[in-house]
Amino acid sequence: MERNIWHHNIRKYVILIKAGLIALLIVAGLWCAEYQNRWQSRMDNAQELMQDLRKQDAEALFPKLWQDARCFPVRSSDSTQQNGGTQWENGGSRQSGGTQQENSGLRQRGGSQQNGSLSKSWGFDDGYGEGRSYGGSRRHEGIDIMAVDAGAGELEVQSVSDGTVEQMGWLELGGYRVGIRSPGGLYFYYAHLDSYAAGLQKGDTVKAGTLLGYMGDTGYGQEGTRGKFPVHLHFGVYYDKNGEEKTIDPYRLLRCLETKL
């Protein structure tokens, strides 16, 4: 009798162990598939980014972008992680700024940022080159990352790259903005901020992931103008070509950086 019970228990444990191993293999398979999909997505976007640069006769920019740009410009909910040995700031105080989106609505790509118990999100699509009318007919020189379920001053904006704060302050079109010059010579432009990170000054050296300020709706008027458009971050990338400032479409770059969230 005891022998039968012992054999029964052994069979039960064997079944449990097999079930556990099968579950572990399934989880590992799903994780590998997700990792492969994210990596493949990043590679696909990198290839499309390079094709876009070829169209602009700017192939030399690709290695600079790939090396310099390391963070998505809007922080994710787990942005307290370590990045290259540098602790990303989270929350903290801010300094008041006293930075376009004319097509609002749901965006194709997006993410979220945890603010207390509420999840604040954003989204973006490829609006580079679209027409703009404020201040005269012109084309859009960047990508608008739109706030979804978040107000001005709620979403944190961080530096995409290491670099130096080259420009800071008010622009009629860009509102409160920050311009960062990267080690590779690229100029990353962040506009329509609600306010700046406390202590940030022109000439400061920053790291990828350094808090720059907070997403807002400033611009399109005299200093302090707000509310002329939905809350968003205008993100632009500029480079020098024979002494002339040029822009690139940063959509594919953002897609690549988005996979790092």
Regions found by a protein language model. Give the residues of each.
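Short hydrophobic beta/alpha edge segments that flank linear recognition/processing sites
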Residues: R177-I180, K207-E223
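N-terminal Sec-pathway targeting helices
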Residues: R3-L25
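Residue-level detector of conserved, well-ordered beta-strand and adjacent loop positions
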Residues: M146, R181, A191-D194, K207, ...
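Zn2+-dependent peptidoglycan hydrolase active-site motif and core
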Residues: S159-G199, R226, V231
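Acidic, glycine-rich catalytic/binding loops that coordinate metals and/or anionic ligands
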Residues: Q81, R94, Q113, K202, ...
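Hydrophobic alpha-helical membrane-insertion segments, chiefly the h-region
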Residues: A23-Y35
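Small beta-barrel nucleic-acid-binding modules, principally OB-folds
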Residues: S137-A150, G179-L186, V237-P250
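Surface-exposed, glycine-biased beta-strand/turn segments
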Residues: E34-G98, E102-Y176, A208, G221, ...
